[in-house]
């Protein structure tokens, strides 16, 4: 997992890494933006746990330390059978460790992908547990704000567990008007009022997300599917969706009350639990999930490797990249203005491998003036071969993000060197090389640059 000898608080036991004398670290379960998750054994109790390892340097560099602190504070506040339990928090000079309940059935999202959609009685089982967890959070003044199938895990018995409170808010975060004002969430699941910048009720916003999850469980697709995020939110604000014909009458009556664009008239939890669909007795429970032993041979952990796919970018990170609040130029190939720093920010349907090939080609055609110093699914970094002027070598970073199926956003920015040289490089070399893969460029005969 880590360079144990160099990391304070870690040691060795029987060939495996031991964290602060308490947890014997096992295999890597998954990777995140700021670290990874390991299965581990609590040496005091013998139980298996999940240990989330967070690299402080990455968190600080991304300006996310407050989010990590908030996630820890919230998880200490909520203890519920359908919420992943936080056992312990530890820290060293360079890392934060969260010992969590080990939930081994995988994401609910994975089950939806495999099955296409879920039987109505199974969906009711999951949905009841979701609502129970969400209602408990609200009773403790906690609003999740990023509810989606990827943040819902299943245990071996098929029971649901809510995770990832990194975007959650506490009731005391509300302003004088009693509303929350932070833009956050995931495209397709965030309530339309969250984007209006006039404040929103965290509980009602969570219920909208629950409604989207219920729709996805029953229909096997999103109610507002659209690659263009702007169009997606317009559909959500109009309530522009259709319930599949195979849904029961009670389900077809419930979903519009959850996906009500008006938060004032949207159904509350108290009303929801009294609806016929919610109260109906399920015919059967979801079957248990057969899994391998929780703690397999604790192989020496490897250093974190970069994912082989672009990082997922949610709508609000996308807004933070855009100048102003208008996302449409990203999806329309609008080239008139360019970005203030002379760089590029554009959407494309080109796969990550194609974008990378174009960027590497720029360096190859430059006669050795630029070289590739980093290349992967998350982006490419080009650096000048010559020392450069007083500000050093020119360095250009192109980060690649996924915002929807088959849609990427590429953010090109200066990573070092002289600004005038950077602008010239973007204008004369980068932009012509990337022009025909910018969304909307193929249909527009005018030169296409970035937002």
UniProtKB/Swiss-Prot annotation:
Q: Which UniProt keywords apply?
A: ATP-binding, Kinase, Manganese, Nucleotide-binding, Serine/threonine-protein kinase, Transferase
Q: Which residues form the Protein kinase domain?
A: 23-278
Show the GO MF annotations.
ATP binding; protein serine kinase activity; protein serine/threonine kinase activity
Matches recorded under PROSITE patterns: NAF (PS50816), PROTEIN_KINASE_ATP (PS00107), PROTEIN_KINASE_DOM (PS50011), PROTEIN_KINASE_ST (PS00108)
Stated EC number for the protein is 2.7.11.1
Q: Where does ATP bind?
A: 29-37, 52
Q: What family is it from? A: Belongs to the protein kinase superfamily. CAMK Ser/Thr protein kinase family. SNF1 subfamily.
Q: What is this protein called?
A: CBL-interacting protein kinase 6
Q: Which gene encodes it?
A: CIPK6
């Amino acid at each position: 997992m880590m360079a144990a000898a160099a990391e304070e608080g870690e040691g060795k036991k029987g060939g495996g890494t031991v964290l602060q004398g308490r947890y014997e670290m096992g295999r890597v379960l998954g990777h995140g933006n700021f670290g990874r998750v390991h299965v581990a054994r609590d040496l005091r109790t013998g139980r298996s746990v999940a240990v989330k390892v967070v690299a402080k340097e990455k968190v600080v560099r991304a300006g996310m330390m407050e989010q990590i602190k908030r996630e820890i504070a919230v998880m200490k506040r909520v203890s519920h059978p359908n919420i992943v339990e936080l056992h312990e928090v530890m820290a060293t000079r360079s890392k934060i460790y969260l010992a969590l309940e080990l939930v081994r059935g995988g994401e609910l999202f994975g089950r939806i992908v495999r099955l296409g959609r879920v039987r109505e009685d199974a969906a009711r089982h999951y949905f009841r547990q979701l609502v129970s967890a969400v209602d408990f959070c609200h009773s403790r003044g906690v609003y999740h704000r990023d509810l989606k199938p990827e943040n819902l895990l299943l245990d071996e018995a098929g029971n649901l567990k809510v995770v990832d409170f990194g975007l959650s808010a506490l009731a005391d975060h509300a302003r004088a008007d009693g509303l929350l004002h932070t833009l956050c969430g995931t495209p397709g699941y965030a309530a339309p009022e969250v984007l209006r910048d006039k404040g929103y009720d965290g509980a009602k916003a969570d219920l909208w997300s629950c409604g989207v999850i219920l729709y996805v469980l029953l229909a096997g697709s999103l109610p507002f599917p659209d690659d263009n995020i702007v169009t997606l939110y317009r559909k959500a604000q109009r309530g522009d969706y259709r319930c599949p014909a195979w849904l029961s009458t009670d389900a077809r009556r419930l979903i519009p009350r959850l996906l009500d664009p008006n938060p004032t008239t949207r159904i509350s939890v108290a009303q929801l639990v009294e609806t016929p669909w919610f109260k109906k007795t399920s015919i059967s429970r979801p079957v248990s999930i057969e899994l391998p032993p929780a703690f397999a041979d604790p192989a020496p952990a490897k250093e974190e490797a970069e994912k082989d796919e672009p990082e997922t970018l949610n709508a609000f990170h996308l807004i933070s990249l855009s100048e102003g609040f208008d996302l449409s130029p990203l999806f329309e190939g609008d080239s008139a203005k360019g970005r203030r720093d002379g760089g590029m920010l554009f959407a494309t349907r080109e796969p990550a491998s194609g974008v990378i090939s174009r960027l590497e080609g720029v360096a190859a055609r430059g006669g050795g003036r630029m070289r590739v110093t980093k290349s992967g699914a998350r982006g490419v970094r080009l650096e000048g071969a010559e020392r450069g002027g007083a500000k050093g070598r020119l360095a250009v970073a192109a980060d690649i993000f996924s915002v929807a199926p088959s849609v990427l956003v590429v953010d090109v920015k200066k990573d070092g060197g002289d600004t005038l040289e950077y602008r010239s490089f973007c204008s004369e070399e980068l932009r012509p090389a990337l022009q025909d893969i910018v969304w909307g460029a193929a249909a527009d005969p005018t030169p296409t640059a970035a937002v």
